[in-house]
Amino acid sequence: MFETHKVEIEWAGRPLKLETGKIARQADGAVLATYGETVVLATVVSAKAPKPGQDFFPLTVNYQEKTYAAGKIPGGYFKREGRPSENETLVSRLIDRPIRPLFPDGYKNDTQVIITVMQHDLENNPDVVAMVAASAALTLSGVPFMGPVGGARVGYINGEYVLNPHLDEMDESTLDLVVAGTQEAVLMVESEAKELPEDVMLGAVVFGQKGFQPVIDAVIRLAEVAAKEPREFNPEDHSALENAMLSIAEDELRNAYKITEKAARYAAVDAVKAKVKEHFLPEGVENPAHTAEEIAAVFKHLQAKIVRWNILDTKSRIDGRDLVTVRPIVAEVGILPRTHGSALFTRGETQAIVVATLGTGEDEQYVDSLTGMYKENFMLHYNFPPYSVGETGRMGSPGRREIGHGKLAWRAIHPMLPTAEQFPYTLRVVSEITESNGSSSMATVCGTSLALMDAGVPLAKPVAGIAMGLIKEDDRFAVLSDILGDEDHLGDMDFKVAGTDAGITSLQMDIKIEGITEEIMGVALNQAKGGRLHILGEMAKAISESRGQLGEFAPRIEVMNIPVDKIREVIGSGGKVIREIVEKTGAKINIDDDGTVKIASASAKEIEAARKWIHSIVAEPEVGQVYEGTVVKTADFGAFVNFFGARDGLVHISQLASERVAKTTDVVKEGDKVWVKLMGFDERGKVRLSMKVVDQATGKEVVAEKSEKKDGGEAAE
């Protein structure tokens, strides 16, 4: 019934198995990948023909994690998986980026890649396995895909590169880098690092590319026995149209791209485009030689050629800069004084307002992942409204791009944050992109660093980011610092580097062509370092280190530790005690399982009141100390006094006053405030208190000699 094919290799000390022919047989391509005991299913379906009028390639990559893969049931009311999590969105983008450039120009058939995590062994991260499975499924599917692609994770532990480290090993690693590519070229890099130098980062990329070569070989072996017949795809030849268009539009396009201001340049380009359209698609002509879609596509290609030629020939760019110059920068902090921290970062025509907010433990984000529930105390949200590029558009929940850009900035800042012990606050940063002409994610990195320092967060060092581009024709190439939006789209490589003056904290790289050598990548990384250091210098004009104190409107947090066996007493039955403390003091209180208590409030008085209350519950009273208490019950033999928080003790009738007492209620009544001294504990552990040795007016202990004399007299009686 099944015609199965299987390939198995040893990869980084664990077996990798690729299998096809048994599951999802109606898909164009389907591969079940097993690495260790992590199992991932990847499927590919591509429409037989493009939709009429389609002028782009509709590729969709959906990565999904099923909770049954880790033996769990989804939380929430409905108990089934819902919208994609942030991690699922990020992994979908991670897989999309290296495979998209490998589809030929002109292929516009609707294509969907679905990757499902079926089983997770809690040791091997499924994202790289998913990338390998998707590449294999595409290679087998028959669609025009110029793969296969391999992928690997690289760690850096004790000065050594580690291929595909286990999840628990990543805690020791100063690098988390994922690299993907073909046999000949690197296509994609995504990473977070702890201030590593450029040569170490480049070495990790090269190490990873070598590390995934056995995987590519395995996919090729599987394709040799299981691949479907390649689909016939003949891209249209538009060279004649392009040459004709070049002859009438080249000079005007070159002049348009000499205009440095974005809006004016776009207007000039649109005018040339309208002229071209009128020439090749005149009104009233039936059955024209070219469609509007063809003319638009060829004109776009021509734009790219003109810009690339100009840069390579003149070493001058669209806005008049040379290759290494960064656009003018203005950095400001404290622009929203009632927020906890704020910054305005402007670089040329790219601008971000970034706001930092400090919260408490109860503001942490709970993340339910396959590896278990954990809490995240640093959140960075990136918003890209349509007005930032002078357009109208959709508003609503963030898209994949916004989530991806936010995470890139998060990775850049995260290694420089203080530990929870050093700074017990939850941090949320929001970046509002108010203008965009390239590199808004790196503006977010710079703005976030400024806003956090403005908020008083003790960053280890300021962090800056820069977006770089590369244009290559034959043996000529040009590396561009601080690219514009147009240069981003027209280049052969774009990469974003963020870090401190000491090293890189985040690197994201996307390469669209082959032939980008290790030497070229090294030149690009070193040029990026110069740009990053320049930007850090400009940022330092606004603020160079964290403020010594929090903002006026930020909450204060005091941390205290209590014995674990006292947590129940502080919380109380059904949370009764802690609710009372919160209601009466006004402070927010968070208690961790290890006994760490965080008390937060904008008022120091409220924090101190809550701290004293909690201390009175958990601290043990000391023999010989004087405490204030309240009479809660009277009896013939004495009075019960509540003191030191929730503690009760007995003042025997003989200890109520220095003179003889006939009746307890002659001295005290329920509700009376009294001063008591802790005398000790009886043989059953009950508390023994005394009032007569304390001056009830002042709360001070009575002179010892006087007390002893009275004690002796009373005993004689």
Curated annotation (Swiss-Prot):
Pfam family, one: KH_1
GO cellular component assignments: cytosol
Domain S1 motif span(s) in chain numbering: 624-692
Location (main, coarse): cytoplasm
Cross-referenced CDD domains: KH-I_PNPase, RNase_PH_PNPase_1, RNase_PH_PNPase_2, S1_PNPase
Catalytic function, reaction form: RNA(n+1) + phosphate = RNA(n) + a ribonucleoside 5'-diphosphate
Domain of life: Bacteria
Enzyme Commission number, as recorded: 2.7.7.8
Keyword annotations from UniProtKB, A to Z: Cytoplasm, Magnesium, Metal-binding, Nucleotidyltransferase, RNA-binding, Transferase
Cofactor(s) the protein requires to work: Mg(2+)
Positions annotated to bind Mg(2+): D488, D494
KH domain span: 555-614
GO molecular function, one term: polyribonucleotide nucleotidyltransferase activity
SMART domains: KH (SM00322), S1 (SM00316)
SUPFAM superfamilies registered for this protein in UniProt: Eukaryotic type KH-domain (KH-domain type I), Nucleic acid-binding proteins, Ribonuclease PH domain 2-like, Ribosomal protein S5 domain 2-like
GO biological process entries: mRNA catabolic process; RNA processing
Cell compartment(s), UniProt: Cytoplasm
Family, as annotated: Belongs to the polyribonucleotide nucleotidyltransferase family.
Function: Involved in mRNA degradation. Catalyzes the phosphorolysis of single-stranded polyribonucleotides processively in the 3'- to 5'-direction.
Name this polypeptide is given: Polyribonucleotide nucleotidyltransferase
Organism the protein comes from: Rhizobium meliloti (strain 1021) (Ensifer meliloti)
Gene: pnp
